[in-house]
């Protein structure tokens, strides 16, 4: 059923009902704080790399290392989460990055922090981040129940947009005023606190026997099922294009802010927060039921709208115009992000959701390949032209995918 065909829902009371559930509230808050710290580290590591090397490629490599594990391990994380207690996976995904942040903060305090330390830390923490969609976000849907799954995921998506706004803002300020030592001390403390909060969560789960040899077959089974559903194929295809060609601009935020617009790390953090601010506003309208459109149209249209915003941003010579356009583009990513999760949960059978969502994580994991491509282009063309080339290519591919799968 399309969103336009659904009966009217009183979204505000449903959201209040969700927040009144202790288990949902805990999962929601843990996701909010942990993801804010992840985005903080992503900005801080990119700015650190660019200030040391003055190379856009070096900055994008460091950022990409945080995201590459989604491509390498995302589908396996989805399969494993059906056989291993998801609460345990979530706890490890908090504790291990907290330990990494503690080590990096200690190295910064003693004056021994090197770029390779940050790069390695990003890869280790990113490996744990690759479990997010198939574990914590699935648990959010399970706790909410099938009758509240759409507002629950919408609320979680709005919150994720807020963390992508707050994280870079905090990152820019922390880097400018506290340095790497203060930034990583903050992220370590928050992630240890989140792990403590999740420890007492009661989350019953029926698990299958873990058979590592079976995992490739599970993934193949998920892909075989996806080929029979044009909507799931659309989610996979547009997710790949959007992450590889649109969200790759995130790796160029430090070169754009510091190099192209010649602003401070704090204002670079504000530029990074522009799109998430728009996504937060747009997601709130969706969560409260004010925007009700066909889910596929919202998903594809939101992606295309954001790519148009990137093209305009790349052509802008004004920092504040770029900020405003990226903010508007965030309304597009709100539709894309909300419907990405909602379409997977409504189109996939319950026994295959983790596997199919694990494949979504792999699709998201193509983002760092785009980040690396954008970095290489930036070294030759400059950050503005790199964003322009990636945005235009992504827009063409999105339109082509939508037209092709509409005929199926």
Language-model segments: residues:
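Paired intracellular helix-loop junctions of major facilitator superfamily
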Residues: 141-149, 346-353
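Transmembrane alpha-helix termini and helix-breaking/packing motifs in multi-pass membrane transporters
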Residues: 46-52, 105-110, 166-186, 259-260, ...
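Helix-loop boundary and gating motifs at the non-cytosolic
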Residues: 10-69, 228-275
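Hydrophobic alpha-helical transmembrane segments
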Residues: 115-126, 151-205, 249, 271-273, ...
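Flexible cytoplasmic inter-helical loops of multi-pass small-molecule transporters
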Residues: 3-12, 199-224
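Core transmembrane helices of Major Facilitator Superfamily
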Residues: 124-136, 329-340
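Short hydrophobic/alpha-helical segments at membrane-entry points of transmembrane helices
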Residues: 27, 113-120, 235, 320-326
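C-terminal transmembrane bundle of multi-pass solute transporters/carriers
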Residues: 72-76, 87-96, 103, 116, ...
């Amino acid at each position: 059923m399309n969103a336009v065909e659904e009966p009217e829902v009183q979204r505000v009371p449903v959201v209040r009902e969700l927040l009144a559930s202790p288990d949902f509230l805990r999962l929601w808050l843990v996701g909010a704080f942990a993801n804010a710290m992840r985005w903080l580290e992503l900005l801080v590591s990119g700015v650190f790399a660019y200030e040391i090397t003055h190379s856009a490629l070096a900055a994008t490599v460091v950022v990409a290392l945080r995201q590459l594990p989604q491509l390498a391990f995302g589908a396996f994380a989805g399969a494993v989460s059906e056989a291993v207690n998801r609460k345990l996976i979530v706890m490890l995904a908090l504790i291990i990055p907290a330990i990494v942040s503690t080590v990096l903060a200690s190295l910064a305090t003693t004056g021994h922090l090197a770029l390779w330390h940050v790069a390695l830390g990003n890869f280790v923490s990113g490996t744990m981040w690759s479990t997010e969609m198939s574990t914590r976000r699935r648990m959010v849907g399970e706790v909410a129940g099938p009758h509240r799954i759409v507002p629950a995921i919408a609320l979680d998506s709005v919150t994720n947009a807020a963390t992508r706004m707050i994280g870079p803002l905090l990152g820019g300020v922390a880097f400018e005023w506290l340095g790497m030592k203060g930034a990583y001390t903050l992220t370590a403390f928050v992630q240890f606190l989140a792990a403590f909060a999740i420890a007492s969560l009661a989350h019953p789960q029926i698990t299958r026997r873990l058979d590592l040899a079976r995992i490739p077959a599970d993934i193949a089974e998920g892909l075989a099922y996806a080929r029979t559903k044009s909507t799931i194929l659309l989610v996979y295809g547009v997710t790949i294009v959007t992450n590889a060609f649109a969200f790759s601009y995130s790796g160029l935020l430090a070169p754009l802010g510091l190099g192209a617009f010649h602003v401070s790390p704090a204002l670079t953090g504000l530029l990074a927060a522009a799109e998430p601010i728009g996504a937060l506003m747009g997601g709130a309208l969706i969560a409260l039921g004010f925007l009700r459109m066909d889910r596929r149209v919202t998903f594809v249209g939101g992606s295309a709208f954001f790519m148009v915003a990137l093209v305009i941003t790349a052509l802008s010579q004004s920092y504040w115009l770029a900020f405003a356009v990226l903010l508007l583009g965030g309304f597009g990513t709100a539709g894309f992000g909300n419907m990405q999760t909602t379409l997977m949960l409504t189109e996939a059978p319950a026994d295959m959701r983790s596997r199919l969502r694990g494949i979504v994580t792999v699709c998201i994991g193509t983002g760092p390949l785009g980040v690396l491509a954008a970095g290489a282009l930036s070294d030759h063309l400059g950050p503005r032209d790199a964003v322009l080339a990636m945005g235009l290519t992504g827009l063409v591919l999105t339109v082509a995918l939508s037209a092709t799968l509409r005929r199926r």
